[in-house]
Amino acid sequence: MPQASELGPDEVVFRLFREHFIPDGQKYPNGEAFIPSSIDQDDAKKRGIPVRVTVWDQALTTPSQAKFIWGFNQPVMVFKIRVRDVIQLRARIQRLSMAVVRDPLIATDKAGAEGHCGFEGLDRNKDEPRTKYKTLLDEVAQLCHESARL
């Protein structure tokens, strides 16, 4: 399997969230919004790649396109994350598996599919204490900046 290319530090990605991931009065989602789903885990196993949580390259995909591709009918909130911030967090906490990589959707010809990316390093390591893992997810969530509501 070819290695995925990591996005550069000047790039920005976004993630769609349903409102239940945003605590009342909070500026960013809670860390649970970044826990890889069973679908993320199954996809990684099938493809022989690291577990990836979906994010989108804002230069290639609009939030409306991402919402359509995912088939979301409910309102969503759009939060941006600067890749530079992810790289700095990775260095600070020494989580070398953390990266934002290109992962275009090839099974669809829908507009914006080429902007699909994966946020790696968010799955819990075998011997990682739950409190340390929760702190990691909360720190990632704090990198988010609200961009829109759709």
Question: What are these regions, as identified by a protein language model?
Answer:
Residues 1-13, 28-30, 37-53, 59-150:
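Conserved NAD+-utilizing ADP-ribose enzyme module
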Residues 17-22:
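Contiguous, amphipathic alpha-helical segments that mediate oligomerization or scaffolding
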Residues 24-26:
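Short, solvent-exposed loop/turn elements at domain surfaces
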